[in-house]
Curated annotation (Swiss-Prot):
Subcellular location: Cytoplasm
GO molecular-function terms, A-Z: RNA binding; translation initiation factor activity
Underlying gene: TIF34
Family: Belongs to the eIF-3 subunit I family.
Organism from which the protein derives: Chaetomium globosum (strain ATCC 6205 / CBS 148.51 / DSM 1962 / NBRC 6347 / NRRL 1970)
Biological role: Component of the eukaryotic translation initiation factor 3 (eIF-3) complex, which is involved in protein synthesis of a specialized repertoire of mRNAs and, together with other initiation factors, stimulates binding of mRNA and methionyl-tRNAi to the 40S ribosome. The eIF-3 complex specifically targets and initiates translation of a subset of mRNAs involved in cell proliferation.
Keyword list, A-Z: Cytoplasm, Initiation factor, Protein biosynthesis, Repeat, WD repeat
Protein name (record): Eukaryotic translation initiation factor 3 subunit I
Pfam families in UniProt: EIF3I (PF24805)
Cysteines paired by S-S bonds: none
InterPro entries on file: eIF3i, WD40/YVTN_repeat-like_dom_sf, WD40_repeat_CS, WD40_repeat_dom_sf, WD40_rpt
C-alpha cells in the first residue's frame, strides 16, 4: 500500500473526514485552515478560510453540499463546499471540540469545551441543506454535561439517540428528541478520556478509542460492549472499515512524552484488527509522530490517517487486503459457493 502524502497543513492534524461518496477528503488542523482533496489522487481542491483559532473538528452533510467545522475560536461555521463561502457562524462561550450531522443532514450537534466557569455542553442546531437558505440562530436543544464533560458525540440511526463519550471514560446515551439522559455506562478505565467515536455505516453500532490503550465496539441501542481491541499505546482515533470486517486504530505516545526519535519507539502506526475476532492483523507505518485521526473510505477502497507531523496519508487497499481471510471465513465462503453451485 503506497500512500499518497498530502502536505497542506503546517501544524498537527485534528480530524479527517471523507464525504459519503468517498471521492473527497476534508482535513482540519491546528493551523486554522480546512483543506479539501480528491481522494483518488490527492490533488488539493481548495481551502476554507475564516476561523481564527485551531480547528478541532469537521463534518460533511450527506449530500456533500455543506460543511460544518468547530474551532478553538468558540464558533461553529457552515461552509458552501463548492464555493468555499462561509454561510453561517454560531458563537459559543467556549471552544467547539466535535461537530456531526445526523443521517439526513437536517440537524447538527456540537460539543463544547468545559472552561472558564462554563460546563461542557452538547448543542443541537437545525440545518437547511441549501446554500441559499437562511440558517436559524436558535439552538434547538442544549444538553449540559454536569458530571464529566463530553469529548466526542454523534447521532445514532434515525437520529434516535445522541451518543457521547466522556472525559472520565464513560459513554452516555441521550434521547435524540428531548435530550434526556437514558444511560451512562463506564466503558473505558476511569478517568481515561474517550478520544474518538465513529459509526458503522448503518449507525447501529460504533467504535470508541481511548487513552486507556483500548478500543471498544458498542451497540447504539443499549450501549452493550460487543468487542474490545487492546493496543500497546494510548489511542487517539478508531474507524470501522466497510466491505471487510476490520477496524483501524491510530495513536502513539503523546508528542510531549516522546523522548527518543525512532518512529518505532513511539508506536506511530495505524493498526488493523479483525472486527469479529479481535486479533491484530497488521500495521501500517509512516507517520513521524502520533496518529491523531483515522478515517475509512466509505466505499471500502482505502483509508486516510492524519498525524501530529502535519501530514495526511491516503492509502488505497491492495489485493492482499481484500483476499485476506481467516480459515473459518474461507471455509464459510467455500460452503456458500458449493451450495450455490
Amino acid at each position: 500500500m503506497r500512500p499518497i502524502l498530502l502536505a497542506g497543513h503546517e501544524r498537527a492534524l485534528t480530524q479527517i473526514k471523507y464525504n459519503p461518496d468517498g471521492d473527497l477528503i476534508f482535513s482540519v488542523s491546528k493551523d486554522q485552515q480546512i483543506c479539501v482533496w480528491f481522494a483518488h489522487n490527492g490533488e488539493r481542491l481548495g481551502t476554507y478560510r475564516g476561523h481564527q483559532g485551531a480547528i478541532w473538528t469537521i463534518d460533511v452533510d450527506p449530500t456533500s453540499t455543506i460543511l460544518a467545522s468547530g474551532s478553538a475560536d468558540n464558533t461553529i461555521r457552515l461552509w458552501d463546499i463548492k464555493t468555499g463561502k462561509c454561510l453561517k457562524t454560531w458563537d459559543f462561550p467556549t471552544a467547539v471540540k466535535r461537530v456531526e450531522f445526523n443521517e439526513d443532514g437536517t440537524k447538527l450537534l456540537g460539543v463544547t469545551e468545559k472552561r472558564m466557569g462554563h460546563l461542557g455542553t452538547i448543542v443541537v442546531l437545525d440545518i437547511k441543506i441549501d446554500v441559499e437558505a437562511e440558517q436559524s440562530d436558535e439552538k434547538v436543544m442544549t444538553i449540559v454535561c454536569d458530571e464529566s464533560k463530553a469529548t466526542v458525540a454523534g447521532w445514532s440511526y434515525l437520529s434516535k439517540y445522541i451518543i457521547a463519550g466522556h472525559e472520565d471514560g464513560s459513554v452516555s446515551q441521550y434521547d435524540g428528541k428531548t435530550g434526556d439522559l437514558l444511560y451512562n455506562i463506564p466503558i473505558h478505565e476511569l478517568n481515561q478520556p474517550i478520544t474518538d467515536l465513529q459509526w458503522s455505516q448503518d449507525r447501529t453500532y460504533f467504535i470508541t478509542a481511548s487513552k486507556d490503550k483500548t478500543s471498544k465496539l458498542i451497540s447504539s441501542k443499549d450501549l452493550e460492549v460487543l468487542k474490545s481491541y487492546t493496543a500497546d499505546t494510548p489511542l487517539n482515533s478508531a474507524a470501522i472499515t466497510p466491505k471487510k470486517d476490520f477496524v483501524i486504530l491510530g495513536g502513539g505516545q503523546a508528542a510531549m512524552d516522546v523522548t527518543t526519535t525512532a518512529a518505532r519507539q513511539g508506536k506511530f502506526e495505524a493498526r488493523f484488527y479483525h472486527k469479529i475476532f479481535e486479533d491484530e492483523i497488521g500495521r501500517v507505518r509512516g507517520h513521524f509522530g502520533p496518529l491523531n485521526t483515522v478515517a475509512a473510505d466509505p466505499t471500502g477502497k482505502g483509508y486516510a490517517s492524519g498525524g501530529e507531523d502535519g501530514y495526511v496519508r491516503v492509502h488505497a487497499f491492495d489485493k492482499g487486503y481484500y483476499d485476506f481471510l481467516y480459515e473459518v471465513e474461507r471455509e464459510r465462503q467455500n460452503r456458500l459457493a458449493a451450495a450455490s453451485a
